[in-house]
């Protein structure tokens, strides 16, 4: 009898803790929890409020903490967010090279069919290399996408070898229907005898490869909707403001029929592309080249990045409201 009472006691305690966890979790968590999607040919976290109203949807290319933050923010503002990783998880490629764009097409077609999504208002958004990818995706699938937001963008597609941790063999970063997306071929960045490395000139040298840049330039004029670019004028990782200006030049030359904004911030660096609620005091990142660790500069200032990210968030929400 005592033994049964003991079991009942512990079952009661476990039940109390289990129920209490969910009650407390609901009280403390005021965000919107994602619906995990792991079928239909892609993996993603889907953020949406319960509603019968169709809303604009934003696809966060690259997913991760950054994508989940924005997915939740957009859902809280009355939109839909899809945080979409494409590498580094089980079932996905390990490295960002030879990434098949059909993966994103599957996600976009699924998203477009959701009852809470307005199929005429689907935006892709990315930061840094994922800004490059967002622009590429939007230029190839104009029938599925009606807007792009790119933080610290690129005007061209690059080879896989721009990333030190990728394979050494020259490959495209992106492919579609078995065909390489044209790219600027780059040797891997070379280390030195110090503990720091400068990356900005590496990318500028790539942009000077006139034999490759014309065909590698992203065909932004094919994008079927407004484009919003953000960059920091003091970006020391890569020349994002310069590349944003090149995108603008191509847009102007094509008589682009949609809205276009190229917003550049003073005293801001590459971290304008980072999580907007995290203001890191670190001004350098880490890179491993041939087994040796180096530091590289992000550029900008702590205050400059903070102000830029706050201002950009306001502009971003205004942009989406207008689509």
Regions found by a protein language model. Give the residues of each.
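Hydrolase active-site cap/lid region
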Residues: 137-204
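Alpha/beta-hydrolase active-site loop
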Residues: 95-115, 136
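N-terminal cap/lid segment of alpha/beta-hydrolase-fold proteins
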Residues: 17-53
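Alpha/beta-hydrolase fold nucleophile elbow
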Residues: 116-128
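C-terminal catalytic histidine-bearing segment of alpha/beta-hydrolase fold enzymes
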Residues: 245, 257-323
């Amino acid at each position: 009898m005592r033994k049964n009472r003991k079991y009942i006691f512990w079952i009661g305690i476990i039940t109390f803790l289990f129920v209490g966890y969910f009650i407390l979790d609901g009280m403390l968590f005021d965000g919107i929890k994602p619906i995990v999607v792991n079928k239909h040919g892609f993996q993603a976290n889907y953020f949406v409020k319960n509603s019968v109203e169709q809303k604009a949807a934003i696809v966060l290319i690259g997913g991760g903490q950054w994508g989940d933050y924005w997915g939740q923010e957009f859902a809280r503002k009355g939109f839909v967010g899809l945080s979409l990783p494409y590498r580094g998880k089980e079932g996905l490629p390990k490295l960002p090279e030879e990434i098949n764009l059909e993966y994103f097409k599957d996600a976009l077609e699924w998203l477009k069919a959701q009852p809470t999504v307005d199929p005429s208002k689907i935006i892709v958004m990315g930061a840094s290399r994922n800004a490059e990818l967002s622009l590429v995706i939007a230029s190839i699938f104009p029938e599925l996408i009606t807007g792009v937001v790119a933080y610290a963008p690129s005007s061209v597609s690059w080879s896989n070898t721009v990333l030190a941790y990728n394979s050494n063999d020259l490959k495209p970063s992106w492919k579609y229907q078995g065909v390489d997306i044209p790219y600027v071929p780059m040797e891997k960045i070379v280390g030195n005898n110090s503990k720091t490395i400068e990356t900005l000139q590496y990318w500028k040298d790539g942009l000077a490869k006139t034999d490759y840049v014309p065909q590698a330039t992203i065909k932004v004029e094919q994008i079927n909707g407004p484009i919003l670019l953000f960059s920091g004028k003091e970006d020391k990782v890569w020349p994002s403001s310069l590349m944003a200006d090149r995108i603008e030049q191509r847009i102007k030359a094509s008589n682009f029929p949609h809205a276009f904004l190229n917003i550049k911030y003073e005293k801001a660096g590459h971290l304008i592309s980072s999580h907007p609620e995290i203001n890191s005091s670190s001004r350098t990142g880490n890179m491993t080249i041939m087994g040796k660790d180096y530091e590289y500069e992000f550029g900008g200032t702590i205050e400059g990045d903070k102000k830029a990210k706050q201002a950009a968030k306001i502009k971003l929400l205004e942009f989406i409201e207008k689509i």
